From Swiss-Prot:
Function in brief: Catalyzes the condensation of carbamoyl phosphate and aspartate to form carbamoyl aspartate and inorganic phosphate, the committed step in the de novo pyrimidine nucleotide biosynthesis pathway.
HAMAP family (alphabetical): Asp_carb_tr
SUPFAM superfamilies, alphabetized: Aspartate/ornithine carbamoyltransferase
Entry superkingdom: Bacteria
GO biological process: one example: 'de novo' pyrimidine nucleobase biosynthetic process
EC main group: transferase
Protein's name according to its UniProt entry: Aspartate carbamoyltransferase catalytic subunit
PANTHER family reported for this sequence: ASPARTATE CARBAMOYLTRANSFERASE, ORNITHINE CARBAMOYLTRANSFERASE, MITOCHONDRIAL
Length: 309
């Protein structure tokens, strides 16, 4: 019997069930413990990045090769002949999908991954980020990192700090964790960057408890996971940014009363919202989180391309 992810488009984290999320996390752990370079042998995966990327692209391409696949593609779509000749995205997808077994794509346009899935001739499309919309593989590595450090995905106290309005990673992670039981969220952000109403409405409908705070110091002792994000300078004038930035910088001193199991996560790149003295604490986990991205993407690719898993 094929797993439910076999040949499935991975466009939005909301379209994955709790059971599918658990299967990906479990498979990532198995591949971390016991690498398997034969899982997608003879499969070719397109890695098509229509906007520049470093971490996501390298992570996907490493994952593909570690489980036996081959990669074709590009990392700056604006410089390809596709763009220079004015080919539509739909036609580009039709052409590229005729060469490959799966299609990993990042695109600056919201909804581009959904569009690609409609023109890929049945080839599964994996969304590696479409504008400010979705970035499901980041959420998968976040879930795996949480499970690795906490041993569970339920009964967690999780704070999201910084830019909660525009940060697609926090939207998707909140949606994913809402599928699990008895998780409690703390939203810490300036009013101008608060979690969007539609996310809060989804959480209300799901019965998920959450609280809103303007500073993080008071919530840190309550947490299992502290998920930091960058407050983007371009959203504020200079004086307002200086004030807001200083309120959302995590230092080692902030962690003095933290639970022993607390882990600090960050989708990276960080700028100055986590000081380097945090790196030396046992709570820092953001660089291990990056490594976990390879295992999570190995698991995702293996399940999408291997019927027997």
């Amino acid at each position: 019997m094929a797993n439910s992810l076999y040949q499935k488009h991975i466009i939005s984290i909301a379209e994955l069930s709790r059971a599918e999320l658990e299967l990906i996390v479990k498979t990532a752990g198995q591949l971390k413990a016991q690498p398997n370079p034969e899982l997608i042998k003879h499969k070719v995966v397109a890695s098509c990045f229509f906007e520049p990327s470093t971490r996501t692209r390298l992570s996907f391409e490493t994952a593909i090769q570690r489980i036996g696949g081959s990669v074709i593609g590009f990392d700056n779509g604006g410089n390809t002949s596709l763009a220079k000749k004015g080919e539509t995205l739909a036609d580009s997808v039709r052409v590229i999908s005729s060469y490959v077994d799966a299609f990993v794509m990042r695109h600056p346009q919201e909804g581009a991954a959904r569009l690609a899935s409609e023109f890929s001739n049945g080839i599964p499309v994996i969304n590696a980020g479409d504008g400010s919309n979705q970035h499901p593989s980041q959420t998968l590595l976040d879930l795996y990192s949480i499970f690795e450090t906490q041993g569970r995905l339920d009964n967690l106290d999780v704070a999201f700090v910084g830019d909660l309005k525009y940060g697609r990673t926090v939207h998707s992670l909140a949606q994913a964790l809402a599928k699990f039981d008895n998780n409690r969220f703390y939203f810490v952000a300036p009013e101008a960057l608060a979690m969007p109403d539609y996310i809060c409405e989804e959480l209300d409908e799901a019965g998920v408890k959450y609280q809103v705070f303007s500073d993080m110091e008071s919530v840190i002792p309550e947490l299992d996971i502290l998920y930091m994000t960058r407050v983007q300078k371009e959203r504020f004038d200079e004086s307002e940014y200086a004030h807001i930035k200083s309120a959302y910088i995590l230092t080692a001193a902030h962690l003095s009363d933290a639970r022993s199991n607390l882990k600090v996560l960050h989708p990276l790149p960080r700028v100055d919202e986590i000081t380097t003295d945090v790196d030396k604490t046992p709570h820092a986990y953001y660089f291990e989180q990056v490594e976990n991205g390879v295992y999570a993407r190995e698991a995702l690719l293996a399940l999408v391309l291997n019927e027997s898993l």
